[in-house]
């Protein structure tokens, strides 16, 4: 239920977790195109990360990427959902036996999608600039996710859109630590070692969530490059010494 997006969306609807309107399909012929509004997002139901996720702005793009989604899906199933404009956030959480804790929030910086571009992020702002009312909604949604999906003693995170009129729509969630350097960022910002907590939960040890409020605003920045031979980076050590940059990681793909 947590790796297949159509079942995930169904459980969200059943548990009153706000999420975008959607339809599931197995072939293009069963799609009622009169019900598809634009812009929309097309994706396979069971691929990881942003693989096969496209914003579509017209029927031709929708048909093209709907067919691609079927081809990428292990179960040959795609999903079309309403595109909600606004700021994308990620909410990192940990649920113990007793309660759900929101550990950290971040606002993603998104590449402006055009010409069928895969939706990706080029960085984030930590913590996300959310009002007290929105933080209360963030916490309520985290509790609904934990209850609806019967989560106990596990890290999880969810991604959502905060609309211009301050409503939250959940995109998806995963019962694990966020990918990439999330574990490092969470520990640096909040002091909470989410990897150690996850291991303790797997071993049956009691997890105590001790975290601190972020005293600074952090920015992560992803630099994408064209294929080539990497040589070196200049100026990083100087910026790190001056405490302008906290750290840098090189990821080879």
Named regions from a protein language model:
Residues 57-58, 93, 223-226:
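Short beta-strand-to-loop capping motifs
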Residues 77-78, 144-149, 206-211:
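Short helix-to-loop capping/linker segments positioned immediately adjacent to catalytic or ligand/cofactor-binding
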Residues 3-79, 84-86, 96-98, 128-144:
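Active-site nucleotide/adenylate-binding loops and adjacent lid/helix of ATP-dependent enzymes
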Residues 31, 197-251:
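Peripheral (often C-terminal) accessory segments that flank ATP-dependent C-N-forming ligase machineries
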Residues 82-89, 93-151, 155, 162, ...:
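ATP-dependent carboxylate/phosphate-activation module, predominantly the ATP-grasp catalytic core
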Residues 167-168:
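Conserved protein kinase catalytic/activation segment
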Residues 2, 56-59, 185-192:
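Short, conserved loop/turn and helix-capping segments at secondary-structure boundaries
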């Amino acid at each position: 239920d947590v790796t297949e997006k159509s079942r995930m969306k169904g459980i969200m609807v059943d548990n009153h977790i706000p999420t975008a309107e959607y339809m599931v399909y197995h072939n293009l012929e069963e799609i009622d195109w009169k019900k598809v509004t634009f812009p929309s997002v097309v994706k396979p139901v069971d691929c990881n990360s942003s693989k096969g996720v496209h914003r579509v702005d017209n029927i031709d793009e929708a048909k093209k990427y709907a067919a691609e989604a079927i081809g990428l899906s292990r179960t040959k199933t795609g999903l079309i959902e309403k595109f909600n404009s606004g700021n994308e956030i990620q909410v990192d959480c940990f649920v113990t036996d007793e309660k759900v804790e929101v550990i950290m929030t971040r606002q993603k910086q998104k590449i402006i999608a055009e010409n069928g571009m895969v939706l990706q992020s080029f960085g984030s702002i930590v913590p996300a600039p959310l009002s007290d009312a929105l933080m209360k909604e963030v916490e309520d949604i985290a509790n609904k996710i934990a209850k609806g999906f019967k989560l106990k003693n596990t890290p999880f995170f969810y991604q959502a859109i905060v609309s211009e009129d301050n409503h939250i729509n959940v995109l998806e969630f995963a019962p694990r630590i966020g990918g990439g350097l999330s574990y490092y960022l969470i520990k640096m910002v909040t002091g909470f070692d989410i990897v150690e907590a996850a291991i303790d939960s797997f071993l049956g040890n009691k997890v105590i969530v001790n975290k601190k409020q972020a005293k600074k605003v952090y920015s992560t920045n992803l630099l994408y490059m064209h294929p080539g031979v990497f040589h070196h980076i200049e100026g990083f050590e100087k910026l790190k010494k001056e405490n302008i940059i906290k750290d840098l990681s090189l990821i080879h793909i």
